[in-house]
């Protein structure tokens, strides 16, 4: 599918809130003598396409022939967008084009300064007329709504009705709690928070997810209903509920992930790709984006590289791992073992462990440690081979090798949130239990063990 898509150049029209994302990179190593605040010394500035413009950049990077329709102010940000996007922009004098300035220090966002006018545009009729003039040449339409006043109910209604009459799919990245203005669109892509607000549900757990996503489809006359679930992936409702699981290995910045999702979905629908396959591909695109910093676009080459990820990069020293874990406010799950001959029982155990948090770290006994615990004939596989096998599983985020007989020193160093052991530790002392917030015991699959596998092989000889 990737080979086919990478050769296509569908014409896609984007209407919405085009904005500028500015990144001011600073050194924040001093406290001001005037007040208890950081002093930010500017090092460089980086101006990027944001909002609907980032969707445009994603589609262009994917190879689409993209055309932008929008309204901007008579200011520097408006000029920047006109110079960097192919399309037509109506100029509303005195209106501020959305400009978001992110103050960055040591790869972390410290502060964001926004300049914008969120009132409804005064040029609705002119924008609709421009759309009517252009629409017949396109294979898909994207409405990218950031609640900055361009996609008014009148504009949305006119765009959706016209496109629907021409059998052109309309994909909407919605904003706000009232989705009625998007009624009749092909699909919406709200995130979990946006969906909860629109549905007025307390949560989307268990049966509530299917109930809610189906309600969105029915209430707003959609062809497909989609909810993006962050680390849980993408939920799709067509005739029934399907989940495309998330693919991210490392998350540094979620900025722009939603833009990448709708860009890939639009590209796929413009090429008549089956919707669930499109969702799976959108997940892979989002995984690429969240591994970078800032609003960035994604290409099919990057998605291909991600699909063939070098899993050895998941094998870290404890120092490297601690630095990575500190960058994210995630729930860290830790388990450990020899994992000499990986079997079905190991797989189910690790899969269950992953579900307990956001990041699963596996502490792996080194060759010397295994020999000390199991005897001179072990391990069967070297520590590098064992680490690679564990890292190859999508539910394992990191593998770290330790030399000691127990993982106490490693647990003390990493300080995970949850420590996972097998249910056979129920009446035993769990090493490191006093360091973590919680200990979870998981039942093993019966009948599976490395020792039994080794004995079985010996018996056959």
Swiss-Prot record:
Keywords: ATP-binding, Carbohydrate metabolism, Kinase, Multifunctional enzyme, Nucleotide-binding, Nucleotidyltransferase, Transferase. It catalyses: D-glycero-beta-D-manno-heptose 7-phosphate + ATP = D-glycero-beta-D-manno-heptose 1,7-bisphosphate + ADP + H(+); D-glycero-beta-D-manno-heptose 1-phosphate + ATP + H(+) = ADP-D-glycero-beta-D-manno-heptose + diphosphate. GO terms for cellular component: cytosol. Residues 1-312 are annotated as: Ribokinase. This is Bifunctional protein HldE. One of its GO terms (biological process) is ADP-L-glycero-beta-D-manno-heptose biosynthetic process. The active site is at residue 259. NCBIfam families: cyt_tran_rel, rfaE_dom_I, rfaE_dom_II. Its EC number is 2.7.1.167, 2.7.7.70. Pathway: Nucleotide-sugar biosynthesis; ADP-L-glycero-beta-D-manno-heptose biosynthesis; ADP-L-glycero-beta-D-manno-heptose from D-glycero-beta-D-manno-heptose 7-phosphate: step 1/4; Nucleotide-sugar biosynthesis; ADP-L-glycero-beta-D-manno-heptose biosynthesis; ADP-L-glycero-beta-D-manno-heptose from D-glycero-beta-D-manno-heptose 7-phosphate: step 3/4. One of its GO terms (molecular function) is heptose-1-phosphate adenylyltransferase activity. It comes from the Bacteria.
